[in-house]
């Protein structure tokens, strides 16, 4: 009888945070909105708060960066560790150290689905449809996958069944699609700057931005718009048609997550050939099933917010069953290892985190070490051939441990 590898149990889970409202500002890391001054990501970008003029100019003005980065580390009995980062900060630390720890410690490192199910069910009474709690669960889940990969000596994508393509090709999200084209990306996604409170003038301004970028980038380069939940159905339909002459590939997250009927109406009335996409701020498997039923073209879960890799795999299966694509919201290595195994993810997102989008900067810089970035818009699967997610925690960052158990 062949020997079966004996897997260790989890000895301890630990949680730290960096950045956010109670630590240093501009820390970056898992909370990529927590950037310094003069950064494109905090420019005049349309949001649900833009209708209040005092919060229109800057997303940080209404507190988009107050949470900061959550870091979860799990340690096995043999001393090996796995970790992950997400957006949950100090409050996420409390949830891990005071509640979720009981479902993690003492389990085998391979008990990922069991731990995941127990975390979900134990937090139902205060998690609602996602948000902070789901971000925290996602971070734990990713840390568990990282640990499991390191214990067995395999990259996470091989634990999921292996790659279905040799490389991942990327589009870039940022303010300068023209620069993204020069860097080898297949497309560029820009934020909208105006919303329903700006009326038709806002539509004309955003359409003019698309027209300008189309002239700079040429006919074949993809252009997309990220609307970040800032619109209503009528405005979104008008904006989509205003941008149609400039061959806009898709219009993204026009409406808040709960407005499923609105997404169905938008898809029905969008210009022929223009895709409708959403999912970044949906936080449960059930919400993605309902979103899929609206008929949108691409679902865009964030693996650090939707329940982790365990849930992302299930979301991809839902999308595949309906002939839809799943293109995760930019999550660096945490999505790279997933999407290279998905047959319905032909490309992926890279979020530009340099202030003016002119240089390639790792998305979760500086909290991750050895975080890969695309070369000529691509990452080859061989880059991912390291145990776990293939990155290390930068312990020179100011890691704050606010709680213990």
UniProtKB/Swiss-Prot annotation:
Its EC number is 4.2.1.90. It catalyses: L-rhamnonate = 2-dehydro-3-deoxy-L-rhamnonate + H2O. Its cofactor is Mg(2+). This is L-rhamnonate dehydratase. SUPFAM superfamilies: Enolase C-terminal domain-like, Enolase N-terminal domain-like. GO terms for biological process: amino acid catabolic process; carbohydrate catabolic process. It comes from Escherichia coli O81 (strain ED1a). InterPro entries: Enolase-like_C_sf, Enolase-like_N, Enolase_C-like, L-Rhamnon_dehydrat, Mandel_Rmase/mucon_lact_enz_CS, Mandelate_racemase_C, Mandelate_racemase_N_dom, RHMD-like. It comes from the Bacteria. It holds the Pfam family MR_MLE_N. CDD domains: MR_like_2. Mg(2+) binds at residues 226, 252, 280.
């Amino acid at each position: 009888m062949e020997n079966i590898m004996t897997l260790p149990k989890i000895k301890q889970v630990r949680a730290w945070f960096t950045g956010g409202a109670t630590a240093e500002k501009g820390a970056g890391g898992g909370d990529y909105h927590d950037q310094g001054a003069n950064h494109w990501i905090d420019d005049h970008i349309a949001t649900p708060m833009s209708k209040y003029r005092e919060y229109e100019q800057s997303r940080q003005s209404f507190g988009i960066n107050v949470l900061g980065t959550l870091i979860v580390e799990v340690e096995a009995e043999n001393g090996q560790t796995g970790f992950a980062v997400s957006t949950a900060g100090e409050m996420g630390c409390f949830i891990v150290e005071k509640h979720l720890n009981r479902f993690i410690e003492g389990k085998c490192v391979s008990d990922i689905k069991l731990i995941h199910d127990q975390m979900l069910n134990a937090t139902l009474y205060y998690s609602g449809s996602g948000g902070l709690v789901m971000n925290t669960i996602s971070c734990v889940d990713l840390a568990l996958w990282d640990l499991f990969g390191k214990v067995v000596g395999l990259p996470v994508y091989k634990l999921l069944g292996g790659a279905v393509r040799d490389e991942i090709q990327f589009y870039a999200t940022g303010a300068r699609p023209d620069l993204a084209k020069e860097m080898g990306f297949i497309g560029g996604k820009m934020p909208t700057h105006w919303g329903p409170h700006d009326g038709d003038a806002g539509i004309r301004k955003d359409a003019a931005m698309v027209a300008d970028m189309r002239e700079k980038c040429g006919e074949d380069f993809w252009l997309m718009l990220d609307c970040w939940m800032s619109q209503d159905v009528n405005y979104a339909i008008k904006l989509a048609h205003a941008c149609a002459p400039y061959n806009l590939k898709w219009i993204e997250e026009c409406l808040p997550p709960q407005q499923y009927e609105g997404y169905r109406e938008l898809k029905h009335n969008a210009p022929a050939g223009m895709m409708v996409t959403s999912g970044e701020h949906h936080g449960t498997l059930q919400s993605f099933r309902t979103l899929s039923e609206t008929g949108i073209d691409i679902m865009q879960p964030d693996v650090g917010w939707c329940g982790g890799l365990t849930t992302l795999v299930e979301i991809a299966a839902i999308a595949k069953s309906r002939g839809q694509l799943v293109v995760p919201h930019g999550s660096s290595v945490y999505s790279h290892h997933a999407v290279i195994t998905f047959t319905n993810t032909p490309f992926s997102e890279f979020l530009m985190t340099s202030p003016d989008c002119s240089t390639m900067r790792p998305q979760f810089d500086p909290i991750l070490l050895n975080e890969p970035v695309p070369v000529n818009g691509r990452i080859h699967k061989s880059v991912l051939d390291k145990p776990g997610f293939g990155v290390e925690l930068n312990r020179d960052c100011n890691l704050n441990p606010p709680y213990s158990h």
